[in-house]
Design a protein with these regions (language model features):
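Preference for protein termini
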Residues: 552-556, 592, 600, 646
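In a subset of proteins, long, contiguous C-terminal domains/tails are tracked
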Residues: 96, 602, 607-609, 616-646
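Surface-exposed intrinsically disordered loops and tails
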Residues: 378-384, 577-618
């Protein structure tokens, strides 16, 4: 008996904890059963079905004082009164109070799901969240849509922080929920009346961030498949460059999809904000200094020299972004290449990984490994482009096997600083994983770097306030923090995407197409969208390379654009044909179609299949070897370049 009672009490407690409505239902059922039982007993005792005396005793214990005047036995009336005291005066009040406490607690913890429609759904609450909310507020103004934020963290803590940041008026449009975005059932509940836009953010420093976001995106595709709903604007944030690499091989587009998707690689976006948009402080329009200073023209003797310390994801992003944009006319006229130096202790393994990742680029590149032995003797290994491909890229690489604090690297940096404005424009990006160590490294560099005003960019993923203060001093005026997570989503990203869409529309116009920018953009796969973004990123660099009149330098800048395009394609994983293969391909395409042999047709089909399947591109060649039709595309791009930044 004791065990049965204990089991009953456990189940009752669990039911009360897990569901507030169940407790109320059980209570009211118990009251009704007791009341009808009492009514039956009353009928047996006095033959009366009237319920009013029973109700009176249940609701008002004071009514027991007049029990002697009633025909019911006093003992029976006492039993009803005691039951009423226990259930109505004590338990019912407690249950109702607990009910409202539970409602409030569920809201605070983010358990309650508001019945939103046509809202903005933000899955995750990483450091980009505040800027996304500011962007929505700025674009929508007083008509700001309802926003639902789903976080796997503490919903109440997040809500309180947002109230402090944005105020109660804005928070009246925002609800914070707790949930896991990668769960299909969770996403189905959140999007039962699907949002008009969804941001897949994730949380800061969460494991398997990209895998969770891509899984969530796949769940969304499943929910939308075959459903007649309005189109959803979707933004997917990725943190790993390998995720972007994989997406390059997907051929899907948004042309007939119910989801319009924009992928943002957070690490690459930090690098583009630093080197392309160059927005140091948005509130006063202060810019980061350009790697190319005021511009590099055909007559310039200087080339860009970017030194990047650390072999980290942000270091790779900064280095490859520089390789995307730093292409100048003086390579055509004087053979001056952009130089990118990567510095790290025990660099061998990371260097091999980096070279393997961009194997097709390094097959055509000049690069070298610089190190010092135990006696301080300098050792240098030089690598040349493979002879079968040719030597035509305008980027060269250095890998330096030493710590930035080592005497050898400090001497080397001092030598580079002495060459600044004479044979190169030196810039330094400190990109280690440890933000505190990055600050220390930036403060104790060779004195000549500060004296010669060499730009020093310091990666600060959390807060940049320490270096902001340092930047305001005379000694450290050339120190610039970058990469703060809160800056990842900002107006500069949208501006770059807009230029990319205009560039794609310009290219389509050259091919005789006339759809609008958004329709054309939807028809592109991830690789082509990325290519257009990279082309847009280089526009400002080209405009700074013009001496007087753009029309006088079209051919020169067209060659510069093709040099940039070569590196872009190689960074994306495309490979070039060998010289022998290029000669064979040119011989086939220069033969009239009617005159081609069967063997030539089969070989041409193999070339085209290799381009689609293996990313082999036959236009990765020196500009002089390019077909006239391909050259015309570069020329028209240059002629219309001002339209892209209107």
């Amino acid at each position: 008996m004791r065990k049965a009672v204990k089991n009953f009490m456990y189940k009752l407690a669990r039911l009360s904890a897990e569901g507030r409505f169940q407790t109320l239902v059980i209570l009211f059922v118990a009251i009704i059963v007791f009341a009808f039982g009492c009514l039956g007993i009353q009928y047996l005792l006095i033959g009366d079905w009237s319920p009013w005396r029973i109700i009176e005793l249940l609701l008002d214990p004071g009514a027991f004082a007049g029990s002697s005047a009633n025909s019911l036995p006093i003992e029976f009336q006492l039993l009803i009164t005691l039951f009423g005291v226990v259930f109505f005066t004590a338990i019912l009040i407690n249950v109702v109070a607990n009910f409202f406490d539970s409602v409030i607690n569920d809201y605070r913890k983010g358990v309650e799901r508001p019945p939103f429609k046509n809202h903005t759904l933000i899955l995750g609450a990483n450091s980009m969240l505040d800027n996304i909310l500011r962007s929505i507020k700025q674009s929508e103004g007083a008509k700001m849509s309802k926003i639902m934020i789903v976080t796997s963290g503490d919903a109440e803590e997040l809500r309180n922080r947002l109230i402090t940041t944005f105020g109660k008026s804005v928070m009246g449009r925002i609800s914070v929920m707790r949930g896991r975005r990668e769960m299909l059932s969770e996403l189905h509940q959140l999007s039962d009346a699907l949002a008009r836009s969804i941001y897949f953010l994730g949380e800061d420093d969460e494991p398997n961030h990209d895998a969770k976001s891509l899984r969530c995106y796949r769940h969304l595709q499943t929910l939308c498949a075959g459903a007649k709903r309005r189109r959803i604007e979707c933004v997917v944030v990725l943190n790993q460059t390998s995720s972007s690499h994989i997406l390059q091989y997907e051929q899907t587009t948004d042309e007939h999809s119910p989801i319009k998707t924009t992928y943002i690689n957070a690490v690459e976006n930090h690098a583009q904000r630093l080197l392309v948009s160059r927005n140091f402080r948005l509130h006063d329009n202060t810019l980061y200094p350009a790697l190319y200073r005021e511009g590099i023209t055909a007559e310039s003797e200087c080339g860009v020299h970017l030194v990047v310390t650390g072999m980290t994801p942000i270091a790779f992003a900064v280095a490859t972004t520089a390789a995307q944009i730093c292409h100048f006319p003086n390579f055509v006229t004087k053979g001056v290449r952009t130089k990118i130096s990567l510095v790290a202790p025990k660099i061998g393994h990371d260097m091999e990984l980096f070279i393997d990742r961009y194997a097709h680029l390094f097959a055509l590149s000049h690069y070298k490994l610089l190190s010092w032995d135990a006696e301080g003797q300098r050792r240098e290994q030089n690598f040349e482009p493979k002879a079968e491909y040719g030597d035509f890229l305008d980027i060269e690489w250095e890998f330096i096997d030493a710590n930035i604090e080592s005497p050898h690297v400090r001497d080397w940096l001092s030598t580079c600083a002495e060459a600044d404005t004479k044979s190169e424009y030196l810039s330094l990006a400190i990109c280690g994983d440890d933000a505190v160590q990055n600050v220390a490294s930036s403060l104790y560099l060779p004195q000549s770097l500060y004296e010669r005003n060499i730009p020093i960019f310091v990666y600060q993923p959390t807060y940049g306030e320490v270096l902001q203060r340092a930047h305001n001093t005379k000694r450290y005026a050339t120190l610039y923090p970058f990469g703060m997570r809160s800056d990842c989503f900002d107006p500069t990203l949208q501006a770059r995407l807009q230029v990319a869409k205009r560039g794609n529309a310009l290219y389509a116009t050259l091919l005789g197409q006339t759809p609008d920018e958004e329709t054309l953009w939807d028809s592109l796969n991830y690789t082509l969208r990325r290519a257009n973004l990279w082309a847009a990123n280089s526009v400002e660099v080209k405009l700074c390379s013009v001496v007087t009149n753009l029309d006088d330098e079209v051919e020169l800048l067209a060659e510069v654009e093709h040099n940039r395009w070569n590196v872009e394609r190689l960074l994306m994983g495309f490979t070039s044909l060998s010289r022998a293969e290029r000669d064979e391909y040119n011989a086939i395409v220069n033969t009239a179609e009617a005159e081609r042999t069967e063997a030539q047709r089969e070989q041409l089909a193999r070339f085209r299949l290799a381009k689609q399947r293996d990313f082999v591109h036959y236009d990765i060649v020196p500009y002089d070897s390019l077909s006239d039709s391909a050259k015309n595309i570069d020329r028209e791009f240059i002629k219309n370049i001002h339209q892209l930044v209107k």
